[in-house]
């Protein structure tokens, strides 16, 4: 049995208030009896219908692997999933590097990063890009001065933390360089806002591998092309970030060990055993899940810590 619920954001976590048995209290022999369901959070940034369509196959496969019902919780924004994990009401989620850093800075004992997705060439990083409409007179990053910029989400690595931080390291203060900045409501929503003329430029994530016309091999641009929401000829990329660590799949640290082992066994074999489902959930072409740990994100955590200190 599998179900789907919706998280409307951090405040909407009240819908999860029905008791969810605490995994920490379960023994290895009875942990399944303690689970009403295994709850997977789905990050915002893509319209809910497409998110649920992409993850529908994984929902049933994880349920089969663990032997418990699985529920999907699509959130309106990154914060909804982060708060669900912190509250112990979600057991697993795929996060961006900045989202994990945000959770760690609030509670280092809440979740553990266990896997990340390799790119098709085996690399463990991706890029933020700034884009404009193809019919714009903005041809370079320098031309963006005095124009408006849409960030994706305040908890996004590629859609906020890294591009803003990298510009600041180059002496560019975004609030001074751009005429205005704002949040588009997610990666997909920001692209649409730029195409509709609400902002002059936006920021999103991509592998920068493969064919430009296809939206590269993986990332928000690829998902939008695949879903018929974007023609790459309608935008122009004018800036690329340094490499950003691929985001982790995290699990609650109090997840029973047997559940953790079964989950990791399924996920690490998913690309070979269920390639079509893997491609859907990966958002394009990717190299499979590979083990990762906290150390991979220490630089991101420090960058996020500095961002938090600078905002006080």
Regions found by a protein language model. Name each.
Residues 35, 40-65, 75, 98, ...:
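Bilobed "Venus flytrap"/periplasmic-binding protein-like clamshell domains
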Residues 27-42, 46-57, 251-312:
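An extracytoplasmic/periplasmic, membrane-proximal ligand-sensing/linker region
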Residues 148-150, 154-256:
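Pocket-lining segment of extracytoplasmic ligand-binding domains
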Residues 73-110, 211:
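Pocket-flanking alpha-helical
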Residues 43-44, 127-138, 239-257:
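A bilobed periplasmic-binding-protein/Venus flytrap-type ligand-binding module shared by bacterial periplasmic
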Residues 1-11:
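Bacterial N-terminal signal peptides that target proteins for export
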Residues 110-123, 234-240:
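A structural signal for short loop-to-beta-strand junctions that line the ligand-binding cleft
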Residues 10-19:
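Bacterial N-terminal signal peptides
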